[in-house]
From Swiss-Prot:
Biological role stated in the UniProt entry: Paralytic toxin that immobilizes a mealworm for 7 days. Inhibits the transient receptor potential cation channel subfamily V member 6 (TRPV6).
Name of the protein: Soricidin
Lineage: Eukaryota, Metazoa, Chordata, Craniata, Vertebrata
GO BP, sorted A to Z: neuropeptide signaling pathway
Record's keyword annotation contains Disulfide bond: yes
Origin superkingdom: Eukaryota
Length: 54
């Protein structure tokens, strides 16, 4: 759910750097996420998987 993801991101990120409404619109695909809050939130909410040695 975009609103829950963006709310979590606003807690994890510095709130001054995040506009929750913009984040939600980007998450829903209604706004491009080029260099905006959506890109920032993706780093917190969906970090890259690290390949662990086996």
């Amino acid at each position: 759910d975009c609103s829950q993801d963006c709310a979590a991101c606003s807690i994890l990120a510095r709130p001054a750097e995040l506009n929750t409404e913009t984040c939600i619109l980007e998450c829903e695909g209604k706004l491009s996420s080029n260099d905006t809050e959506g890109g920032l939130c993706k780093e917190f909410l969906h970090p890259s998987k690290v390949d662990l040695p086996r």
